[in-house]
Amino acid sequence: MAPVLPVVLPLQPRIRLAQGIWLLSWLLALVGGLTLLCSGHLLVQLGHLGTFLAPSCSFPALPQTALAAGTVALGTGLGGAGASRASLDAAQYPPWRGVLTPLLAVGTAAGGGLLTLALGLALALPVSLNQGLEEGLEAALAHYKDTEVPGRCQAKRLMDELQLRYHCCGRHGYKDWFGVQWVSNRYLDPSDQDVVDRIQSNVEGLYLIDGVPFSCCNPHSPRPCLQSQLSDPYAHPLFDPRQPNLNLWAQGCHEVLLEHLQGLSGTLGSILAVTLLLQILVLLGLRYLQTALEGLGGVIDGEGEAQGYLFPGGLKDILKTAWLQGGLAHKPAPEEAPPDEEPPKEVLAEA
């Protein structure tokens, strides 16, 4: 059987190959560690912002997959660096001969598969992030008033912290607060006619006002923050509703969070692409180095040329050999076949 993609490797190219693999392996370990840091950072960010994502959003799968892929890449890089360094010394290489095959198998199957999957998620999942933030922020605004409802007691605090930290207001702007009841019922006087009129003015029976929570206010504004009657042009003589309100955060939280998370996922995707490229180069180099040294008995400075290859034969030949070996393993040879047992003498006598 002819080997797949054979390469003739004299002495000096073998040494340069081992040295190059050593350098690439350390780069892979470095980038793998960077992948761990970036995916861990994104996972922590999603832990803080998970309240504002819809439960059906699958975006958190990206940092989880990237975390596993970075771990395998880091291990592959460290293993490749150790194996390539040991290959330069005939006394140190024998212990690594039994490690290289499992390392190549795990690096190809687990590392390559996880990196490819994580890179695909980095390209595909940011599209679903838009809808996930839409639904999550809509629910967050609707539950802002539920400070005494079990399971939603922290909704107000989390939304206020989000708007203050990311300098945003509402979902797409401060007017989003006009369409939801954000004042808790415990602060409403049912005997107040204005409260009754506002509740009866909509079919949902909500207390709707043209105001915003305090967390929408920009503390750097030189003027006092205007929070109520924002749609009434006569309520605030110095405020024109048709002009940008410098007292309130101009951007909506959807736009800010989408840009923030897509930026993190884009950075992680770029690192994953570099990691996948280095993983392929290291695994290919290790495979050629392994097969070349096997032909020399594990001695890199052995006399003569060595041939490195990916597979000892084509895919068809490999499958055929495996099939034949599997069939022969279950079929005993003629000389090993057990002799036919003779029937008991009692049975012969009765016959």
From Swiss-Prot:
Function in brief: Plays a role in rod outer segment (ROS) morphogenesis. May play a role with PRPH2 in the maintenance of the structure of ROS curved disks. Plays a role in the organization of the ROS and maintenance of ROS disk diameter. Involved in the maintenance of the retina outer nuclear layer.
Q: Which organism is it from?
A: Mus musculus
Which residue windows does the record flag with biased composition (Basic and acidic residues)? Answer: 342-351
Name recorded for this polypeptide: Rod outer segment membrane protein 1
Q: Where is this region: Disordered?
A: 329-351
**What outcome is recorded for mutants in which this gene has been deleted?**
Knockout mice are viable, fertile and grossly phenotypically normal. 50% reduction in maximal rod photoreceptor response at 9 months of age. Progressive thinning of the retinal outer nuclear layer becomes evident at 1 month of age. Evidence of rod photoreceptor degeneration, shortened rod outer segment (ROS) length, increased ROS disk diameter, and progressive disorganization of the ROS at 1 month of age, leading to near-complete loss of organization by 2 months of age, however organization returns to near normal levels by 4 months of age. Rod photoreceptors progressively die by apoptosis.
Q: Which InterPro entries match?
A: Peripherin/rom-1 (IPR000830), Peripherin/rom-1_CS (IPR018498), Peripherin_LEL (IPR042026), Tetraspanin/Peripherin (IPR018499), Tetraspanin_EC2_sf (IPR008952)
**Transmembrane intervals:** 20-44, 65-84, 103-125, 264-286
**Per UniProt, what is the membrane topology?**
Multi-pass membrane protein
Task: Give the quaternary structure.
Answer: Homodimer; disulfide-linked. Forms a homotetramer. Forms a heterotetramer with PRPH2. Homotetramer and heterotetramer core complexes go on to form higher order complexes by formation of intermolecular disulfide bonds. Interacts with STX3 isoform 3B. Interacts with SNAP25.
Q: Name one GO biological process term.
A: cell adhesion
Q: Which residue ranges does the entry give as Cytoplasmic-facing topology?
A: 1-19, 85-102, 287-351
Q: Name where it's found.
A: Photoreceptor inner segment membrane; Photoreceptor outer segment membrane
List residues in topological domain: Lumenal.
45-64, 126-263
Q: Which UniProt keywords apply?
A: Cell adhesion, Cell projection, Disulfide bond, Membrane, Sensory transduction, Transmembrane, Transmembrane helix, Vision
According to its UniProt record, which protein family does this protein belong to? Belongs to the PRPH2/ROM1 family.
Q: Name one GO cellular component term.
A: photoreceptor outer segment
Q: In which tissues is it expressed?
A: Expressed in the retina (at protein level).
Lineage per the UniProt record: Eukaryota, Metazoa, Chordata, Craniata, Vertebrata
MF terms from GO for this chain are:
protein homodimerization activity
